[in-house]
Curated annotation (Swiss-Prot):
The gene is OPI8. This is Putative uncharacterized protein OPI8. Partially overlaps DID2. Disruption phenotypes caused by deletion of this gene may also be a result of a defect in its overlapping gene. It comes from the Eukaryota. Disruption phenotype: Deletion results in the overproduction and secretion of inositol to the growth medium.
Length: 213
C-alpha cells in the first residue's frame, strides 16, 4: 500500500499560511507500507485518517479511525545566497507523535484501536520572490512545490504487524528521505541555514535557534 494524500488542493492551500508566496504546483512523494495506509485529509495540527488494512484485523473488514497530533515542531531551511533563488525557503513541519486513535465507524465488535505514529513529515518548499526579482523570474522559476512523506508509521498491539515488517518500513521510509535530501542538494545552487522552530498554530511559529549547515 501507499501513502495516499486526500484533498490535495485544500491541503496545499492551508499550508500557504507558512509563506507569503502562493503554492502554484506540488508533487507527492509516496512511501510503501506493508500492512496499512495513511490518508491525509486535513492540514497539519488538525486531524488525519488512518485506514487499517483488513489483514491486520480479526475479521475481514477494514476500519477507518481518526487520530489527533499532540505535539510537533518545524525545521525551516532558508537560503542565504544572492542569486535569483535568494529567497527560497523550505519549511518542514514534523508532527512526530500521534496518539488516541478513535474509530469513525465500528463495523467490528472491537474497542477503539490505539495507534502510535512517529515522525510524520509534511513539508512545503516555496520561492518567496522579492518585488525586484518576481517579474524577471516568474516564468523561468518553479515558484513552489509541495511534498508529503511519512516515516516510521506503525500500529501497536497488532500481532500480524511483525518486527520484520516494521524494520522493512523504516528502511523504506528513511531511504526515501535520504533521496529527498539529495534532491535538494542537487537541484538548488544556494547556501542554506537551518532554523529550528517549535510549531503550534502557524501564526505562533517562533524561532528557537539557528546554525549554518
Amino acid at each position: 500500500m501507499f501513502f495516499q494524500p486526500l484533498n490535495a488542493l485544500s491541503l496545499c492551500a492551508s499550508l500557504s499560511s507558512f509563506s507569503s508566496s502562493t503554492l502554484t504546483s506540488f508533487a507527492f512523494i509516496s512511501g510503501t507500507l506493508s500492512s496499512f495506509a495513511l490518508c491525509f485529509n486535513s492540514m497539519p495540527f488538525s486531524s488525519a485518517t488512518l485506514l487499517i488494512s483488513s489483514s491486520t484485523l480479526s475479521l475481514s473488514t477494514s476500519m477507518a479511525s481518526e487520530f489527533t497530533p499532540i505535539s510537533s515542531y518545524t525545521l525551516t531551511l532558508v537560503s542565504k545566497s544572492s542569486n535569483c533563488c535568494s529567497n527560497l525557503s523550505i519549511i518542514m513541519v514534523i508532527c512526530w507523535r500521534f496518539i488516541f486513535c478513535n474509530a469513525l465507524s465500528m463495523p467490528l465488535q472491537t474497542c477503539p484501536i490505539d495507534a502510535d505514529t512517529c515522525l510524520i513529515v509534511t513539508a512545503v518548499c516555496t520561492l518567496d520572490a522579492t518585488e525586484s526579482t518576481r517579474d524577471a523570474n516568474f516564468n523561468s522559476c518553479n515558484l513552489s512545490f509541495f511534498f508529503l512523506i511519512a516515516l516510521d508509521a506503525y500500529i501497536r498491539d497488532i500481532s500480524s504487524f511483525s518486527l520484520r515488517a516494521r524494520l522493512s518500513l523504516l528502511v523504506s521510509c528513511f531511504s526515501s528521505f535520504e533521496a529527498l535530501l539529495a534532491c535538494f542538494c542537487n537541484c538548488f545552487d544556494v547556501n542554506f541555514s537551518w532554523k529550528r522552530v517549535f510549531s503550534k498554530p502557524a501564526a505562533e511559529l517562533r524561532d528557537i535557534s539557528q546554525c549554518d549547515v
